[in-house]
Amino acid sequence: MSADRLPSYSVAELNTAIGSLLERGFAPRFLLEATVSRPQLKKGHLWLTLTDGSASISGVVWASKLAQLSYQPKDGDGVTVVGKLNFWAARASLTVQALDIRPSLSTVLRDFERVRQVLEQEGVIDPSRLRPLPSQPASIAVLTSVPSSALADMLRTAAERWPLTQLIVVPIPVQGSVAPTIINTLEAIAERTAELGLQALVLARGGGSREDLAVFDNEALCRLLANYPIPVVTGLGHEDDLTVADLVADHRAATPTAAIVALLPDREAERQGLTQRQSRLKDTLLGRILRERQRLQDRAVALQQQSPREKIMRKRQELIQKHQLLKALSPERWLKRGLALISNKAGDPIPGLESVKIGDQLNIRMSDGSLEARVDQIQPSAPNTTS
């Protein structure tokens, strides 16, 4: 190509042309995964280098946007940047203008592990420190974003399960660099737990990415939760999400709704349980009444048997029985049947012939009198013979 056919530019024209190409040929918005290096604040703007280890590019967050960010990166943080390209034609400088910056999952997990290890070594994270939850709390504080679907679900669940419990809803931001705000709110509530009659606190946030839950890994926030004056229940994110706040809480629930379920009894189950306990108590009392009644009856019988009148009646009955026995055994009864009672002159009974001899005087007593007789003859009975 001849020199007269080549496009000719001044430096300014070349840089302007490059800028125009970038504006027309590159996406107006893009996501950039990078690691932050050497962040510096200059005149309210945040300047930094974004690198992936093999390449780097300058980045900037203008002061107006910096104030709106929920997260401000530190040196070495992995981040996801929502950005656009800025090209300064005067010096052919290419910079990523960050519209939003969020920590990458690797950064969030690294911070989680760091705080967890520190608190475990100090004994702040220790199962033995966990406190039991109140069985039927009269009042609990609920800290979450307002309005939110998580709050709506919690309020509905509380009304269905145990409407007697008062829920004091305290709005808080739940994402970004908001740990100081949450800490201030928690400290204010802690000073009024007795005044408000609070028996537990729920810290809740609905679903989102693990990166969105990074605030609940804040070390100062977690130390405050671990030493809170009332039991703390967390319901943060999804079931698979785990934050340091979950580890220091007295109870970790999988979701915000599950946190309410953990704190409040089920009124239908309680009603059934009350009915069963009432039935058991009724059976117990009835059994006791029957036993006491039988015991009183036994004592009444015993006292009746020991009374003088009863003793006299028993003795009288014994005398009647003995009299009847004596009457049945009386000789008079046998004499009336034709038998006689024989005795010698001395009055001794004659049991048999061996007690008399010829000439003895005998007295024969009969039913209607007696007579005297003399023995003239003794005739023994013939002995029994066996064939």
Curated annotation (Swiss-Prot):
Bidirectionally degrades single-stranded DNA into large acid-insoluble oligonucleotides, which are then degraded further into small acid-soluble oligonucleotides. The keyword Hydrolase applies. It comes from Synechococcus sp. (strain CC9605). It catalyses: Exonucleolytic cleavage in either 5'- to 3'- or 3'- to 5'-direction to yield nucleoside 5'-phosphates. This is Exodeoxyribonuclease 7 large subunit. The gene is xseA. PANTHER family: EXODEOXYRIBONUCLEASE 7 LARGE SUBUNIT (PTHR30008:SF0). Keywords: Cytoplasm, Exonuclease, Hydrolase, Nuclease. InterPro entries: Exonuc_VII_L (IPR003753), Exonuc_VII_lsu_C (IPR020579), OB-fold_nuc-bd_dom (IPR025824). Its EC number is 3.1.11.6. It is found in: Cytoplasm. Heterooligomer composed of large and small subunits. GO terms for molecular function: exodeoxyribonuclease VII activity; nucleic acid binding. Belongs to the XseA family. One of its GO terms (biological process) is DNA catabolic process. The keyword Signal does not apply. It comes from the Bacteria. Pfam families: Exonuc_VII_L (PF02601), tRNA_anti_2 (PF13742). GO terms for cellular component: cytoplasm; exodeoxyribonuclease VII complex. Its main location: cytoplasm.
